[in-house]
Amino acid sequence: MGKSVVILGAQWGDEGKGKIVDLLTDRVKYVVRYQGGHNAGHTLIINGEKTVLRLIPSGMLHPNVTCLIGNGVVVSPEALMKEMGELESRGIKVRERLLISEACPLILPYHVAMDHAREAALGKKAIGTTGRGIGPAYEDKVARRGLRIGDLFNKEAFAEKLKNILEYYNFQLVNYYKVEPVDYQKTLDDVMAIADVITGMVADITTILDTARKNGEHILFEGAQGTMLDIDHGTYPYVTSSNTTAGGVATGSGFGPRNLDYVLGIIKAYCTRVGGGPFTTELFDDVGAEIARKGNEFGAVTGRPRRCGWFDAVAIRRAIQLNSISGFCMTKLDVLDGFDEVKICVAYKMPNGEIVEYAPLAAKDWDGVEPIYETLPGWKENTFRITDVNKLPQNCINYIKRIEEVTGVPIDILSTGPDRVETMILRDPFAA
């Protein structure tokens, strides 16, 4: 009997999803991306070799896996071809194993130009986007004016649609943002030069997934970003432009929600966030700096330093509600080695004195919120690369168990290093 498993970030992204997807891909036939775009950087380290995948599913490094990009993903043709080229130069036959929905919206140069222009205009109030055109591409999708991969099949119609939409964008870029317009002919020529390669990978993703399920195949859905960045349920407006929660699987791939068997929430042993927005447990002291240093907390795509803080069980409880999380995978446990004490935020004190155990929704509702911590003894022993749970320090085990208690969800997988072998699977999601 095949199982369908979702892997998603339960915090603000950068939790280490790529490694865990890669680890569990050994068990599956299909790996599916269902939301986001090339703003998601999944870093994999296999046999000491580092690979960063931004758009193509992490399963591409496994020769027997077919990778699918669902309709919920916005696709930059330029980024796709660049990533394909990087993988093909290593002997990976991407075109034989990558299939893409024709309903995927395209990210084109005018989306990137608009993204940069808006962030510059906002100044210090900027959202902190990756500047890759993700948001504007999703806007076009909702406004029903966007170009999609399926439009590449009719080159004449594509050229006409592109001309109309570029007039719309260039008017804003020139007259409102006072920046250079995007060149129509260059944009058209660049896309047409690679159109046949992209259309050659188009497939009916929904039917492929339905057939795989009926045939008893294991399927893995690979989420990008994190729950607290969800466009609807995250810390709005400091969010991404897609549904990063488990509901995005159904809408972003066409896979029926009743067919999902297990949702694995990836959590760091602490918390990080990139860009603006509320972050209740953020540390501004030497402890925060030490976590950032030990955890090498810099964005895989942007290179920006990540904000660091203690584990926030309040935000995680919201993630559990939103995703019906079956179990956690805790990553970067080894980063907390050596601290005299470790803390877990178990509640928030609101500005009016109310104590709450679930995170607010809108960013404005986080203003003035204070974390209420439980402090536990730390551990001096080294947990890096430990692969036997019985060899973990007792205080480390106590920390893990306390997180399970305050969240009500078991930690089924533990990660103690960047390589996929540096992992303890306590309960296999495909056997749960």
UniProtKB/Swiss-Prot annotation:
Residues reported in the UniProt entry to bind substrate: 300-306
Q: Which GO terms describe its cellular component?
A: cytoplasm
**Primary site of residence:** cytoplasm
Instruction: Describe which pathway this protein belongs to, using the record's wording.
Output: Purine metabolism; AMP biosynthesis via de novo pathway; AMP from IMP: step 1/2
Q: Which residues form the active site?
A: 14 (proton acceptor), 42 (proton donor)
What's its catalytic activity?
IMP + L-aspartate + GTP = N(6)-(1,2-dicarboxyethyl)-AMP + GDP + phosphate + 2 H(+)
**Listed SMART domains:** Adenylsucc_synt
Cofactor info, note text: Binds 1 Mg(2+) ion per subunit.
List of residues binding GTP? 13-19, 41-43, 306, 332-334, 415-417
Query: Molecular function (GO) terms listed?
Result: adenylosuccinate synthase activity; GTP binding; magnesium ion binding
Q: Which cysteines are joined by disulfide bonds?
A: none
* Binding, IMP: 14-17, 39-42, 130, 144, 225, 240, 304
Q: Quick one: a GO biological-process term for this protein?
A: IMP metabolic process
The superkingdom of the source organism is: Bacteria
State which Enzyme Commission number(s) the record gives: 6.3.4.4
Keywords of this protein's UniProt record, alphabetized?
Answer: Cytoplasm, GTP-binding, Ligase, Magnesium, Metal-binding, Nucleotide-binding, Purine biosynthesis
Subcellular localization: Cytoplasm
Q: What does this protein do?
A: Plays an important role in the de novo pathway of purine nucleotide biosynthesis. Catalyzes the first committed step in the biosynthesis of AMP from IMP.
Name the UniProt record assigns to this protein? Adenylosuccinate synthetase
Q: What's the encoding gene here?
A: purA
